[in-house]
Design a protein with these regions (language model features):
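Exposed, flexible binding/inhibitory loops of compact, secreted disulfide-stabilized domains
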Residues: 1-124
Length: 124
């Protein structure tokens, strides 16, 4: 399935724990972002929730700039949508800076109202 990555459009956000959720309304998305980022100004791009839904996956805090999340695939499996994510972790010697980062991905895709399942190899 095709999707749009909205991560850069919402700016830097900080999710202090592993988070995964699907949003079918602007208010639900805004509430979750505000609850996880108190006091931080939020910027939401235009999203037509009549036609699209949004999925959030966040890794929680990481110790350097070498971590990142990547959407590997988004598949409609008939009775559900499956989002597969890969977390990039730094190797010894990678040019990274030691500081707390909060990798996340926020994607929009055609609305289906099917359950959305996260497949994140190596994570519960």
């Amino acid at each position: 399935m095709r999707y749009e990555d909205l991560t850069r459009k919402v700016g830097p956000l900080e999710f202090t724990r592993i988070t995964r959720d699907v949003f079918r309304s602007r208010s639900a998305l805004r509430d979750t972002l505000a609850r996880n980022n108190p006091g931080r100004p939020l910027t939401l791009p235009p999203i037509d929730f009549n036609r699209r839904e949004v999925f959030l996956v966040a890794a929680g805090p990481r110790s350097s700039t070498g971590y990142d999340l990547r959407i590997v695939s988004l598949r409609d499996e008939g009775d559900r949508i499956v989002v597969t994510v890969h977390e990039r972790t730094p190797s010894l010697g990678d040019p990274v800076r030691a500081r707390v980062t909060y990798p996340f991905r926020l994607i929009a895709f055609p609305r289906s109202d099917k359950p959305v399942k996260l497949k994140w190899p190596g994570r519960p």
